[in-house]
């Protein structure tokens, strides 16, 4: 697989004072699924923002398909369009993303911004509604949607662009168990279809279900370890050291035993 995203020695701070990322190195290959896991405040969302060129690092380099991503390179219209067409970003809070009067308007917005013919945009929107099983929401005002419905519409609005890469910030945030299962199955299906997916999470269970390549962000805002899901999840001492699980000790008459808990657990039904 070819490297589609490359980050080299990335540092980023807010207002030049608050360190958010430190010496980040990460490779994402075409067709990979990559899970960035860490506690709240470790820099996960900031890292996605840098990959998507919403912000630029203080130092270090970002590459997309071998080309440097900078404010200057994005001023080249053809490269800027290529990057924006290739990447779709789903925010943790869908209310940030959704602003059109109706669901169908939301799905039309991105294709029309890419100058697709109106008929092509409408066809894509209809197909995406059917693919996600939300055609019944087509004419619904966005403000009337539930949290789970908004999340589905947010990802639908990105899929109408047919991006090669999906960047998803906390895909299971504020979702009920049934909708969590829907998104787990959807991510697996999209990756199986060839989409490159980079997501952030603090759910170890999600890593276990999706089995992506994993990058662990520490509370010091560095990538402490990368590896397969099984390599990361089986290293209990490491997970304790980055505060992703904690140890419980139970004492009995005949001794004691230890077991481990994730700080964040969801249940798949």
Residue map of PLM features:
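H-loop/switch region of ABC-family ATPase nucleotide-binding domains
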Residues: 201-202
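ABC ATPase nucleotide-binding domains
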Residues: 234-269
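Conserved ABC ATPase signature
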Residues: 141-145, 149
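Conserved ABC ATPase "signature" region
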Residues: 119-137
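The feature captures the beta-strand-to-loop junction immediately N-terminal to the Walker
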Residues: 37-39
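H-loop (His-switch) and adjacent beta-strand-loop-beta switch element
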Residues: 214-228
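Helix-to-loop junction immediately C-terminal to a conserved catalytic motif
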Residues: 52
